[in-house]
């Protein structure tokens, strides 16, 4: 570098910029100024950074140049900063034909070249450049005859290596970034930081949680980059001080992808040796890319390893090493020693190769003509709207020509495209935008994982490695991410669960099994979600583990299976040769990835590429071989939800038990009557004990068949045995399996109660027979039959009720069609053939016919026909929806009239209905926080009840022997014919058994899940999708509801509110103004221009307007043009003759003090229409005040007052001038949704605080808030600050619900306690939101909170039922309330236990009576209370307010928003107004670029 050259940099603040057009204008104009080398203008920072020659320009002259363009420029720091330069020495080749002065003039015209010196004798050119603007490669491209003089560079580098290289080079920085969870985070950071001025390259590693940045320190500082990363929500700190690069391009790329080592600071490259060899190793035990990175980073640290490339797919590693220093066997052991030390390595080959000698002292210079292979990354872009292979070819053809694109593969079946690209030349966002520009909907996949490919350098390009020595025993273990990287998920249907103890039993035991990471069991849904390691365990084994616990288990879904996997039943196979024939034939077909045929089961499992081949093609191939093939039928029914099998089981069990119980009950009643009769005789006649015994024995049932065995006890025993052992067999099996795994549940309590009663009775009976007792013992043989009757009745009723709780989900599942009619069309859309196929065989792009009354089998787009479609069960929309060509249809909706042909766009699990079903199922599987308490309580319930039962037995035995009168007083049916001891024991056992019978953990376990299941189902039926029990429970705790503005409170689309006709000396008609303005704005791409054109076409009832020429846009001001050919349009509709009925318009006499209406026709143009007049031109100006003033027009105070009034209401006022006459004013605004004011009022009446949060300016925000009745507003809040604002509200102790569009507001939705995504239609898989409202209706926000409150109230009622039965019933059963006459028999306790579970489920079913309130039901009582707020009642907080601000710099999202924010006034901005601009409503995938809208308004 030559410091004397003196190139400076200055930063100038620029006010008045409103959009990117302003930026472009300043850069173009100032960039042409003599002496200006480079200029970069930032809209969000409102400044311009200029690199200039101080000999030709000064900061003051540059400031004045910007001022002259109509902007306000201010220099805050008058001291310019020096800019680093460098000198290149270029040698002229012998083939040079150009004159020296031509070379000099050519190079001096190049931006970034400050000086040139020519040495003809030495055939050398010394070029002084600014490295941040131009480089040697660009100089060579300008003059190909020049080549870099490496010798001169060596001398210069050796002379002042530290100084010059540090100044002229770039700096590499390693920064630790925390909080990243997925590759979307890395892409966001790379996209935003990579676009900052001075940042050359950036690579963010998710595994290492760090960012490697190559930047120019004179343009950006470390602190600025750190603040930018933290502004995105990721904590960042510098891991290592930045170092100036002294490396070539290859080394930089390698450095960016090499983890930081903790040893010496200076980086050196591993040398290449003359006897380098290459060895290939097979490595088993790698599971993920983290393993690959671990092996590569560890081996590359070895001193004698030149390079290593590890392939996860091929399980191999190719290592280049110095054969004289290390052997392949040593390398093999080194790989096996890499943490965690589980790799198995074998050597396959060794190839000898030679390379250049190393340079031990300094880095070898890389010749300039050696071009390194750049980084290659891979991104997946989801593409909607493709209908055929022509679309695929079109996208591939256009995108493949884009700069930086290496390859592209578009899949019609998967609706996505995989692009390999150079991240230094393009980005995923750019590619996505390019696809959208072609007319398709494109979004970046959440699963994008950058694939970094670095070319293996030749001997001329050695790799950079660390100087660290390799070590093994002291190595820091690498975090094992096997669970996250190598896990699969399956769903298992579980039957036989009765309470929360069963859930806890399954979860606890399965977590102990090797290979199972987590398990979540849903009692009500009867489903278990299991995450497991497929290398260790498979779903059938998991199901078997559950069956061993005593429950039924069936694998119902494998979450890893999806498109590309086919399971078929193949009939006609006789031997192994048939199997071989099918497998070999299929694997020869292109697109078949894997095929396995099992002769024993007659099943074929096939993996295929859906881009190349489809399931119908595979079936046809098998059938062509002479076999029959059909799809394995999947159970699409909701049989596991309606509990039909369980209902049948318990109904049968109840009837069997009842058959034996009725005689037992008859005997018991008979004995009770007789005991009462004898007690009366004893009381009246004062009979002795002997007389009582004789009287009892005279009864038929008390007669002894054998000594000690009465007829009564024999009959009771015979009736009890079948019930005890056959009716109770199910309970014995379940109790045994539970106890085997050291757990206890309701079945254990039942078995204990019945077994103790039966065993006690049998033992006492055998003892009496052995002793030949004359008095018959009192037994409990009547207890087991009566217990089992009430238990079976309770379970029967409980499962009936459970089936009712799942009706909503069952209805959704029943909507799924089973078959589809696929048709074949010719080129003229004439039907050629029809074919009925299973819905699983439908592929994307198929043409499907749907007849009247039929269900749509898949999501699709109508290509032919008109009809009305019933979507009520999916969206909650009661009225049928009209469908025409181009309309989208939803799977499961019903076609009412008219046949339709649709093109399938989403099939299988990707359909809207499948997504809704999946979401509701997962919601009903999840557990609410309050349920976790119940589950924990149930785990201790059974042991506690057993303890209470034993304690009751012992206490009553002790009380009986100490004070027999108590037992005698409260023992029902006591007679003096039995001994005291027997009476005490029987009474104690009766109380103990009753305690076991009445206790019911089931009611506690059912209280929450039944209510959650019914609540989520009712919500789904009403178009409110609640993602689980937690948001359902949390919503009732919400105290603050925060609304986004654009698209939530408002429609999000600008519309014309009012057109005023202004007259001075001449007048012009309303329709003529519309024709002129509509024609003029038809060339505008701005949302406001589009809104004006749309309005004009609607008012004029035409699709074609006049002709617009000489169209010009002046950013920040307005447009000018000339309009012709409108007279024919006006004459056609007879509007040019008379214009008496002017809609939404008035005429204003601007030279008078008052408005006055006019019905006169235009006087500017004569009413006679002729061919000559058709060619008449109108000079049109449309814009703001400043634009009119610039063009010499005077704005009267009355007109200015009109504009101010509109601006106060948050509208944009645009002036129209025709032929230099001010003749019209158009007011445009984003309109408030009709139900918004009512919804806000209802929320306030529910005791909730309502807040409006918007990025729009304060005046517009205040206007919208006043219209809907919101008194607290946060305006000008950037997207990155919305999260901070929500967090601030939460720190005040408030539970916050955030209502937004679910896309741009996703960070705030995730931060809020309850995120509500509104108006997303069929996009029901928004991860950030907790509640998804299918319909774009704000009253559904009210309904979701109301439903939550009703559900939580029902849960509390359920707990009251459960606790009453247990907390009150158990003490009664134990005899605590005997002094007041409350005594329970065991059968009574059993009936109470059964009633508790049934009552809880029936209580939850009351939620099915919930009806979402309608607009009319809300509107009538609120009519008198609703009123707009005055501006003085509204509190507006601007910006981030008092929350801490991480960075003054804006992120990419904020910059895009700012680019598109300028309000209607600022589009055409004059600095006096602060009105807002509204956006057009683009599709949801285009919100990130182009016509982006956050909740702000875009610039014209």
UniProtKB/Swiss-Prot annotation:
Its EC number is 7.2.2.8. Changing residue 1005 to R: In MNK; impaired copper-dependent trafficking from TGN to post-TGN compartments; subcellular location restricted to TGN; impaired copper transport activity. The keyword Coiled coil does not apply. ATP binds at residue 1081. It is a multi-pass membrane protein. A motif (Endocytosis signal) lies at residues 1467-1468, 1487-1488. GO terms for cellular component: axon; basolateral plasma membrane; cytosol; dendrite; early endosome membrane; endoplasmic reticulum; Golgi apparatus; late endosome. Mg(2+) binds at residues 1301, 1305. Disulfide bonds: none annotated. This is Copper-transporting ATPase 1. The lineage of its organism: Eukaryota, Metazoa, Chordata, Craniata, Vertebrata.
